[in-house]
Amino acid sequence: MKNPLKTIRETKPLVHHITNWVTIYDCANITRAFGALPVMAHAPEECADMTGISSALVLNIGTLTSEIIDSMLLSAAAANKKKIPVVLDAVGVGATRFRDEMAAKILGSVRVDIIKGNYSEIAKLAGENAETKGVESTSISADPQKVAKEFAKSSSSVVVMTGKEDVISDGNRTFVVKNGHELMGSIVGTGCMAASIIGSFASVNPDYCDAAKDALCYFGAAGELAAKNSAGPGSFKVNLYDEVFNLSDEKVQAMMKVEEL
């Protein structure tokens, strides 16, 4: 898509989140800074109805409960019926059995269009050996690009692996995004924010691989710009919101660092 940010800001898509309690505020604000409209409806009594009026659904399993899983399944079924994109952020997969089982339940019960996680989380979902510490990636034994491509094929979903370099694949096309700054890893929530941004971009671009690639390029570019005037994590977070708010398609497209394999 030529001008995704302009499209988001003109159409103001509603992006429904069922996300974790640690970063919910950050996800809402970054979605709004990009120009989309965030809504966070977790109750099983209303979540499917909220999805029914939304343009994308973002699921984040960072703070799981059994009731939250029920809401996620209800909303994902509604999203599938409406044919809007479903993004699953597989936070902490590999850390506990419950988390692994619930991620597998979601993937086995509903259509997930975009599966996002760090290197360890995606490797675990793909059946590869991986080490994780809580929700942080430590190491994987396989090549990330190969893991993303093969898992995309087997899951029939777009797979997004985030890290120092982000890998995005739909099984046919594979992109490596090199935008970003190390300060993005110094604050809690940038991974969750990335899922919100991916949902926002996917809400206006039916090519979900392209949408995910663009989302990470734009977010990474904002991180690079924010870092220029930041003394540390505190000022960086404030500057990040400002840089996102002031982004333009022309500015980011001149900064894109993306390789198609």
From Swiss-Prot:
Keyword list, A-Z: ATP-binding, Kinase, Magnesium, Metal-binding, Nucleotide-binding, Thiamine biosynthesis, Transferase
Enzyme Commission numbers on file: 2.7.1.50
InterPro entries reported for this sequence: Hyethyz_kinase, Ribokinase-like
UniProt keyword Transmembrane helix present: no
Domain of life: Archaea
Residues annotated to bind substrate: M40, G189
Required cofactor(s): Mg(2+)
Family: Belongs to the Thz kinase family.
HAMAP family reported for this sequence: Thz_kinase
Name of the protein in question: Hydroxyethylthiazole kinase
Classification lineage: Archaea, Methanobacteriati, Methanobacteriota, Stenosarchaea group, Methanomicrobia
